[in-house]
Amino acid sequence: MRNKICDELNNTDIGKLVNLCGWVDRRRDHGGVIFIDLRDHSGFLQITINPDDGANLFKQAETLRNETVIMVSGIINERPKDSINKNLSTGKLELKVKDLQILNQIKNNLPFPVSIHDYENTKEELRLKYRYLDLRRGKLLKNLKTRHKIIKVAREFLDNFGFTEVETPLLTKSTPEGARDFLIPSRLSNGEFFALPQSPQLFKQLLMVGGLDKYYQIAKCFRDEDLRADRQPEFTQLDIEMSFISEEEIISFNESLIKKIWKEVLNINFDNAFPRMKWQAAMDNYGTDRPDTRYQMLLKDLGEVLGDIGFNIFTKAIKSGGSIKSITVKGGNSSISNVRIKPGGDIFQVAQDAGAGGLAFIRVKGDELETIGAIKNNLSEEHISDILRITEAEDGDLILLGAGDKQIVNQSLDRVRQYIAKDLNLIDTSKWNFLWVTDFPLFERNEEENRYEALHHPFCSPKNIKSKDSENLKKAIENSIANAYDLVLNGLELGGGSLRIHEANLQREVLKTVGLTDKEIDEKFGFLIEALEMGAPPHGGIAFGLDRITMLIIGADSIRETIAFPKNQQAKCLLTNAPSNVSESQLKELDIEITIDE
């Protein structure tokens, strides 16, 4: 049907007869001549139709509506100098139409303009419902091509290092991995269920037991969890696992992979090794294990200085084992008003939404500190000196403070730090600040349920566990650091991994520590324990979020912009109206009865 696409055309095609297919992006009538912007997947070309070219041809062109699918034949000409479009690669060319065929006419008015000129004015819910029209605009297609290139570069890199791509099952066993499973009822095994995998974690470990040595997969994963801008119920991981490998070797190899992707896709080189930070340092200084290091405002611990000044909130925080921390906003006296950091203000609300009761503040004015009386009246000169030294605050700076539970203080000041950095334009968006975060705790304590939870997952190996004595092993595990590592970019986790447990008794003990009984371990993970007893090699790996990598590379705000057919934030597909009801006969086949609470 066609012998060229728009973006292929150049000056060497002038005078040639070409056939093009595409959509009418816009039609304009000027001085008796019809100008049409023809759009295909590659770009645009202006085509012209003159009454002198034939009455029927001109009349047909007059009926064309935007998004009509057409095929045109004609001669490529050079545009007049006064009509050159410097914004297009084909902006110096136009097609003088000799023949026009309508391949498909649109039936009704479109729900939104497809033309790139109206791109920003369409609500996302409408874009998701008519995703095929949104794709046609070109921006999303470009995103998908970038995603394809990222995958292609990763595959070539891993292939060159002897990795084997293996597909692991999508219908598998429900195992506790943190989030809720999507369950699939089995028709043949009445009353039993498959689960869609939250990750290929256990299967890739079993591949190592099977001697594969080096594995990767572009893996679909599923988690039934609450959504946000960088989450989807189904998502894609670049999943990697290796045998006989150390933590240092995994970090070094995967750093090379990421550098290769950025080089090939963005033509950006990173000559130096990515910096590393231990988990505890990240929590102490940033309040999060995903720190954005493009700007300052580090958290500072003021517990020793302010814990005994007599201010009830501070005293209570320290006595209950909590903390008092601060961030310093340089020049904050002039850029942030009291209204914004008091109840009802936007910054106060950010802290409250993160779980904090509120924010205290200190304004530095020369040698004086301005704050509420309950704090100021109890500050000695030594207190003031210590505050200024620890916070590194100077005249004109604003100090914001949080007090209470350590986790909530960290979380709320982290959110406030991010919010203020965006609000005051403190972030250098041209920077790519990669960071390896290492030495995570193996567990975190869930005080409400009085039990331990794995910080990553219960298959991470603990560091420096030497004793195999059961009682000593239990104590050592509870206080252990994990052989785990995350790669963070500009405050977002790109990927995470660990060395895995490859000894059966150690794996059983770790699963017991997170609250499973021997019976539950055998029911849920018996196949893994059995495999580890049969000569499992030391192994480890990592999984990168492909959607998130693509989002950062293309500069989007949501991973929905990187996925062809994403769900909305209620986990619904607006295009197909899924999830949806199924017939009674389908439910009967599965022996499922649905009860709806009134």
Swiss-Prot record:
SUPFAM superfamilies, alphabetized: Class II aaRS and biotin synthetases, GAD domain-like, Nucleic acid-binding proteins
Region (Aspartate): 201-204
Cited Pfam families: GAD, tRNA-synt_2, tRNA_anti-codon
Cellular localisation: Cytoplasm
UniProt binding sites for L-aspartate: 177, 223, 456, 500
Binding site for ATP: 223-225, 232, 493, 545-548
UniProt keyword list: Aminoacyl-tRNA synthetase, ATP-binding, Cytoplasm, Ligase, Nucleotide-binding, Protein biosynthesis
Reaction catalysis annotation: tRNA(Asx) + L-aspartate + ATP = L-aspartyl-tRNA(Asx) + AMP + diphosphate
Domain of life: Bacteria
Molecular functions (GO terms): aspartate-tRNA ligase activity; aspartate-tRNA(Asn) ligase activity; ATP binding; nucleic acid binding
Any one cellular-component term (Gene Ontology): cytoplasm
GO biological process: aspartyl-tRNA aminoacylation
InterPro entries reported for this sequence: Aa-tRNA-synt_II, aa-tRNA-synth_II, aa-tRNA-synth_II/BPL/LPL, Asp-tRNA-ligase_1, Asp-tRNA-ligase_1_N, Asp/Asn-tRNA-synth_IIb, AspRS_core, GAD-like_sf
Chief place of localization: cytoplasm
EC numbers: 6.1.1.23
Role, per record: Aspartyl-tRNA synthetase with relaxed tRNA specificity since it is able to aspartylate not only its cognate tRNA(Asp) but also tRNA(Asn). Reaction proceeds in two steps: L-aspartate is first activated by ATP to form Asp-AMP and then transferred to the acceptor end of tRNA(Asp/Asn).
Family that this chain belongs to: Belongs to the class-II aminoacyl-tRNA synthetase family. Type 1 subfamily.
PANTHER family (alphabetical): ASPARTATE--TRNA LIGASE, MITOCHONDRIAL, ASPARTYL/LYSYL-TRNA SYNTHETASE
Assembly mode: Homodimer.
Protein name listed in UniProt: Aspartate--tRNA(Asp/Asn) ligase
Lineage: Bacteria, Bacillati, Cyanobacteriota, Cyanophyceae, Synechococcales
